[in-house]
Amino acid sequence: MAGKLKILITDDSKLLRKKLREELEKLDCDVLEAENGKEAIMRDLTEQPDGIILDIVMPEVGGIETLQVIKDINPEIPVIMLSSAGTSQKLKQTLELGALDFIQKPYTSEQIKQAVEQIRRKVEENHDK
């Protein structure tokens, strides 16, 4: 895959979305944003991102429920979960549901770079099938 990756960031924190957007744009990604799970599901359906970075803890529709719906719709899409400390059981559940990996908050630029590379590899792998 030679083109830009289109990544959907889903987090209820506007500040975190802004920081993630900046990190992803430095890595030459096109960035979409959603502030909750319901919006993420709609954007996944309408804008077909290459990958998703998804917070676990959000109001209304949480990250786990969002992951389940997105994976039902598009089982191949790579999803990286974001989590705060103390959510290890939830993280295990997300991996069982098909999340590619997770990043613990606070994250580093290197972790975001690695996440983008994981998404890129998965997209290329899916494309080669």
What would you call each of these model-derived segments?
Residues 36-39, 62-65:
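Acidic catalytic/metal-coordinating carboxylates
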Residues 58:
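Receiver (REC) domain active-site loop signature in two-component systems and cognate sites
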Residues 65, 86-101:
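Alpha4 helix (beta4-alpha4-beta5 surface) of REC/receiver domains from two-component response regulators
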Residues 47-53:
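Active-site beta3 strand of CheY-like receiver
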Residues 14-32:
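Two-component/phosphorelay signaling modules centered on CheY-like receiver
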Residues 89, 107-117:
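C-terminal output helix
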